[in-house]
């Protein structure tokens, strides 16, 4: 530890820390623009100047390492004058257009100019003006406001892992731009908006919509992937205006994916706001009572074993649990959250989780990807892995036809024999796995989405056992899930095998990806919030609330249950999921023993211990899975997906549609350059 004095008070701080960090630890406010705790140090804005005794000039505190016996002053006349000078330089070419800037009210430059600026301007020459750069459909630029802090450049390089933003020219003529002014290629590019300290980078979908003080903030969870990123929903009245990240060091740090951030406009389109019944081949708007009575009559006319329920990809645990209880009361055990027919072993909880945990990947030294498209399935997790690779702390190898990643990967091939050789210890990478202290395997849908998924999973378990990847001090076996609801559904046993051909009544709880051709003779009830495939195939439609319109628990891929809070009211005559299921039970005169959300959660916590530990990861058992199924010789390949359209909300998002179009245009432009 190093001892130093800051404004007369002695503190201790670890060696290697900066003067800025020491000042913050001492409780001092140090203005800054270029410094960001999660980015590499640049030291180019000079706003964080402090006075250090025996130094003739003020020092940039963010770039100066501490040394023993340092005496630092943060509030002397020299420091004040230096900061005023720096601020004056920063404002020389700034347009001062705060009334029309989207950053107004939450702008670092505004706040620090007021707190540390002179209040007068001696510059009366013409200001420079810079042409706005095109960065795609998500980021709106106003580059005349840019103060060249380079935060966005460092984020692109160090966090996103794609070097697609840089600076051209020098001095006063310096400009920040994307290469060839193309659409940004990163799935987490929207985070540049958050870290920009001025109004140079803004959200295009949010442009000129609202001011910060007009918005209500609601803590929630991103449901468009299985990572469970913490988000903040900003709304005005009953309209969602924007979505921002909330800090959670164990999951998403301070970042979220572009899909979780921008696809909220999909909540405006194709919404189901009234109950419907199919009459004479056409869906007709009806009252709730008529829809519920029709369902009651149909359920009573069908044998219990012919009734099945399928949950979709963004359904809360409470809704699935309540529907499961209802079906059990009816005498049916046909219910599943596995609408894609994934081959996932559920014999123990550790067999279907991401056991290493998201933050735990920073401890791993060797990672094997098998059939996993981690960049598009879990962009935030991918960013963590990429940062470890770039500093040389982690080596990543891959089996399976993959997709372009944001870091260096060594491809072993796509043959199943590679896994067989690893399992018996004859592959060239056997030595690397034996020497690795913390090896991990990430299994994607290129494995559990195959017809022989169980057989392949059994083979992978042999590799896990061979290299002792699951032990008391390290859990290296990981399933990379695609959807927000699947782990929660597996946790409550909402996962029985269903033969669709024999189903006479299908209850679709937001499920749109099932084999509808096998349900041609079934009566279909669709409970959901968007008019997608499921609604178009339904005989009765029950409009429900989206995840922003009701509170619900979601369990992320590492097994952490979290609560998404209600931000706005349901549209039209739509109701919350558990309210609809409770009303159906009432019409059937079935007592499911739960009248409200609180009672559902109390019962969940009693029956499943994990739900008594919200926001926590519990210890889980893992057992080796053995399958007698036959392996095919089909090459392993991660399943291709359209990243921007993976669920009913993102499919109906205009912003996501623009992203798809922009990415296609980028591919065509790149092809022109190289071919």
UniProtKB/Swiss-Prot annotation:
- SUPFAM superfamilies assigned to the protein according to its UniProt record, in alphabetical order: 2Fe-2S ferredoxin-like, 4Fe-4S ferredoxins, Formate dehydrogenase/DMSO reductase, domains 1-3
Q: What UniProt keywords apply to this chain's record, in alphabetical order?
A: 2Fe-2S, 4Fe-4S, Iron, Iron-sulfur, Metal-binding, NAD, Quinone, Translocase
UniProt domain 4Fe-4S Mo/W bis-MGD-type: residue ranges: 215-271
Q: Which GO biological process annotations does it have?
A: ATP synthesis coupled electron transport
GO cellular component assignments: membrane
Q: Where does [4Fe-4S] cluster 2 bind?
A: 146, 149, 152, 196
State the top-level EC class.
translocase
Per the database record, which ranges form the 2Fe-2S ferredoxin-type domain? 1-78
What reaction(s) does this enzyme catalyze? a quinone + NADH + 5 H(+)(in) = a quinol + NAD(+) + 4 H(+)(out)
- Binding site residues for [4Fe-4S] cluster 1: 94, 98, 101, 107
InterPro entries cross-referenced by the UniProt entry: 2Fe-2S_ferredoxin-like_sf, 2Fe-2S_ferredoxin-type, Mopterin_OxRdtase, Mopterin_OxRdtase_4Fe-4S_dom, NADH_UbQ_OxRdtase_75kDa_su_CS, NADH_UbQ_OxRdtase_ferredoxin, NADH_UbQ_OxRdtase_Gsu, NADH_UbQ_OxRdtase_Gsu_4Fe4S-bd
Query: Has keyword Iron?
Result: yes
Any idea where the 4Fe-4S His(Cys)3-ligated-type domain is? 78-117
Family, per entry: Belongs to the complex I 75 kDa subunit family.
What the protein does? Answer: NDH-1 shuttles electrons from NADH, via FMN and iron-sulfur (Fe-S) centers, to quinones in the respiratory chain. Couples the redox reaction to proton translocation (for every two electrons transferred, four hydrogen ions are translocated across the cytoplasmic membrane), and thus conserves the redox energy in a proton gradient.
Q: Which PANTHER family match?
A: NADH-UBIQUINONE OXIDOREDUCTASE 75 KDA SUBUNIT, MITOCHONDRIAL, RESPIRATORY NITRATE REDUCTASE
Task: Please give the name of this protein.
Answer: NADH-quinone oxidoreductase subunit G
Q: Which organism is it from?
A: Rickettsia typhi (strain ATCC VR-144 / Wilmington)
């Amino acid at each position: 530890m190093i001892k130093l004095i800051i404004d007369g008070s002695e503190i201790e701080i670890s060696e290697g820390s900066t003067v800025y960090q020491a000042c913050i630890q001492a409780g001092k406010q140090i203005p800054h623009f270029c410094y960001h705790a999660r980015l590499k140090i640049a030291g180019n804005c000079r706003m964080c100047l402090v006075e250090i005794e025996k130094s003739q000039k003020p020092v940039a505190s963010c770039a100066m390492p501490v040394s023993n016996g340092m005496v630092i002053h943060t509030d002397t006349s020299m420091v004040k004058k230096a900061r005023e000078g720096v601020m004056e330089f920063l404002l020389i070419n700034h347009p001062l257009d705060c009334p029309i800037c989207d950053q107004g009210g939450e702008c670092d430059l505004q706040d620090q100019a007021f707190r540390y600026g002179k209040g007068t301007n001696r510059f009366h020459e013409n200001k420079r003006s810079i042409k706005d750069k095109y960065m795609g459909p998500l980021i709106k630029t106003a580059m005349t406001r840019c103060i060249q802090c380079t935060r966005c450049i460092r984020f692109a390089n160090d966090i996103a892992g794609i070097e697609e933003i840089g600076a051209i020219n020098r001095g006063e003529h310096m400009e920040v731009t994307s290469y060839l002014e193309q659409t940004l290629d990163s799935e987490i590019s929207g985070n540049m908006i958050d870290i920009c300290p001025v109004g140079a980078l803004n959200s295009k979908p949010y442009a000129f919509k609202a001011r910060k003080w007009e918005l209500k903030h609601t803590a929630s969870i991103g449901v468009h992937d299985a990572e469970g990123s913490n988000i903040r929903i900003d709304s005005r009245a009953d309209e969602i205006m924007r979505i921002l990240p909330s800090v959670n060091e164990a999951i998403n740090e301070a970042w979220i994916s572009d899909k979780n951030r921008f696809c909220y406009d999909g909540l405006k389109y194709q919404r189901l706001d009234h109950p419907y019944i199919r009459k004479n081949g056409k869906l007709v708007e009806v009252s709730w009572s008529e829809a519920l009575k029709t369902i009651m009559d149909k359920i009573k006319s069908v044998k219990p074993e012919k009734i099945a329920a399928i949950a979709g990809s963004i359904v809360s645990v409470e809704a699935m649990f309540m529907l499961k209880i209802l079906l059990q009361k009816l005498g049916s055990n046909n219910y599943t959250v596995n609408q894609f027919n994934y081959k996932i072993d559920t014999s123990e909880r550790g067999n279907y989780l991401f056991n290493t945990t998201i933050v735990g990947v920073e401890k791993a030294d060797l990672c094997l990807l098998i059939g996993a498209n981690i960049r598009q399935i879990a962009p935030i997790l991918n960013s963590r892995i990429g940062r470890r690779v770039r500093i040389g702390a982690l080596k990543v190898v891959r089996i399976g036809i993959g997709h372009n990643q944001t870091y260096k990967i060594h491809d072993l091939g796509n043959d199943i024999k590679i896994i067989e050789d690893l399992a018996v210890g004859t592959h060239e990478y056997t030595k690397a796995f034996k020497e690795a202290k913390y090896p991990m395997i990430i299994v994607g849908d290129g494995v559990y989405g195959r017809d022989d998924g169980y057989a392949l999973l059994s083979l992978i378990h042999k590799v896990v056992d061979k290299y002792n990847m699951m032990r008391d001090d390290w859990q290296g076996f990981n399933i990379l899930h695609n959807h927000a609801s699947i782990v929660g559904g597996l946790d409550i046993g909402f996962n029985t095998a269903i033969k669709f051909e024999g189903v006479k009544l299908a209850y679709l709880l937001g499920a749109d990806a099932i084999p509808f051709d096998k349900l041609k003779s079934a009566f279909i009830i669709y409970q959901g919030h968007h008019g997608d495939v499921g609604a178009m195939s339904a005989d009765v439609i029950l409009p429900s609330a989206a995840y922003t319109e009701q509170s619900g628990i979601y369990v992320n891929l590492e097994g952490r249950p979290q609560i998404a809070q209600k931000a706005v009211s349901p549209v039209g005559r739509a109701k919350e999921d558990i309210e609809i299921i409770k009303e159906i039970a009432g019409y059937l005169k079935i007592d499911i023993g739960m009248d409200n959300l609180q009672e559902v959660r109390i019962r969940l916590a009693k029956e499943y211990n994990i739900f008594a530990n919200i926001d926590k990861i519990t210890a889980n058992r893992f057992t080796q899975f053995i399958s007698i199924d036959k392996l095919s010789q089909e090459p392993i390949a991660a399943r291709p997906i359209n990243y921007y359209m993976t669920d009913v909300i993102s499919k109906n998002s205009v912003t996501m549609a623009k992203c798809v179009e922009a990415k296609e245009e980028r591919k065509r432009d790149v092809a022109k350059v190289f071919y």
